[in-house]
């Protein structure tokens, strides 16, 4: 690798940049799918001994990766598993005890055992009103692993929480910055600056997330230079100026 002589560490650079600017670093990991190992919904494709060996190797790789993330970069604010992390009793990687042992103050989101925060039920940057931080379950699951009540009425339980819930599971309202005008793109592509949300949309998201007792997570991703596009940066600064005015 030519970049930094093959000795670069993107996670280190990211965490250092966060700390430099007073931002608590969090890490987003995807372990539900892996094309190299042929993994779909946490399971390696195939059957028999070969499948079992590949599944064991994949689990070992994932658990090693999570251990590395939890030990090399100091305290983390949150680890977010995209699509969750399945239950180890189903043969999936066992990541919860690793995070809890090595990052005891880090928010864990999420598997079929625990969710210390919850997805807000859409990728619109908003939640419903009212929105309670209390919840009926201490996990949210995903797909078929989700508790039966979660998917009812358009994910109403995720969008509103439960005023009588006994678990503290506050909502996160996520949206990609480049999600305007019929586009919904979490990753950078050239020539789609027209799909950056206008300021009035971003302000509306703020009022309907932070203003409704949720955290707004706005998706920005680097371009092919490794930096955040200037147009994206300027638009988020406009939002910040409006909110702080």
Question: Language-model segments: what does each one mean?
Answer:
Residues 1-245:
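Mature catalytic domains of secreted/periplasmic carbohydrate-active enzymes
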């Amino acid at each position: 690798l030519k970049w930094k002589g093959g000795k670069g560490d993107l996670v280190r650079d990211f965490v250092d940049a966060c700390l430099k600017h007073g931002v608590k670093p969090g890490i987003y990991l995807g372990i539900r799918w892996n094309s190299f190992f042929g993994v779909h919904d946490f399971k390696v494709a195939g059957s028999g001994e070969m499948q079992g060996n590949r599944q064991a190797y994949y689990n070992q790789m994932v658990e090693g990766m999570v251990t590395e993330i939890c030990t090399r970069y100091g305290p983390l604010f949150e680890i977010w598993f995209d699509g969750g992390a399945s239950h180890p009793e189903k043969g999936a990687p066992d990541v919860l005890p690793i995070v809890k042992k090595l990052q005891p103050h880090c928010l864990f989101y999420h598997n079929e055992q625990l969710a210390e925060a919850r997805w807000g039920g859409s990728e619109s940057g908003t939640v419903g009103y009212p929105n309670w931080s209390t919840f009926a379950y201490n996990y949210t699951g995903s797909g078929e692993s989700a508790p039966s009540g979660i998917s009812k009425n358009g994910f109403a339980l995720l969008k509103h929480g439960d005023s009588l819930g006994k678990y503290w599971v506050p909502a996160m309202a996520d949206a990609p910055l480049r999600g305007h005008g019929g586009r919904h793109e979490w990753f950078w592509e050239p020539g789609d600056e027209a799909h950056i949300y206008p300021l009035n949309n971003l302000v509306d998201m703020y009022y309907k997330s932070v203003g409704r007792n949720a955290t707004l997570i706005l998706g920005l991703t680097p371009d092919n230079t490794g930096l955040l596009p200037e147009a994206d940066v300027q638009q988020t600064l406009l939002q910040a100026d409006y909110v702080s005015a």
